[in-house]
């Protein structure tokens, strides 16, 4: 079980990333385009740096939806490997069964 503060901080970051996503994409496109004048490119880079640090999607962490475990996250389920195993054994994940060969 992850600390509640870590889970809450990650949720806050998700909201900040969503809020600034369009502006970041716009600025990054300006910086990336070769036809952008050098002065505009420098202004766009400065504006991008002025955005909050948590607006970058790289700072998000994939966490288990049930208990917030940060490692062993399986995207398909949104759960950690430990939680997937437990739920699969109990039959709570439709279409998932223990393989044997």
UniProtKB/Swiss-Prot annotation:
SUPFAM superfamilies: Glucocorticoid receptor-like (DNA-binding domain). One of its GO terms (molecular function) is rRNA binding. One of its GO terms (cellular component) is small ribosomal subunit. One of its GO terms (biological process) is translation. Residues 31-74 are annotated as: Disordered. It holds the Pfam family Ribosomal_S14. Keywords: Ribonucleoprotein, Ribosomal protein, RNA-binding, rRNA-binding. Residues 61-70 have a biased composition (Basic and acidic residues). Binds 16S rRNA, required for the assembly of 30S particles and may also be responsible for determining the conformation of the 16S rRNA at the A site. Part of the 30S ribosomal subunit. Contacts proteins S3 and S10. Belongs to the universal ribosomal protein uS14 family. This is Small ribosomal subunit protein uS14A. It comes from Nocardia farcinica (strain IFM 10152). The gene is rpsN.
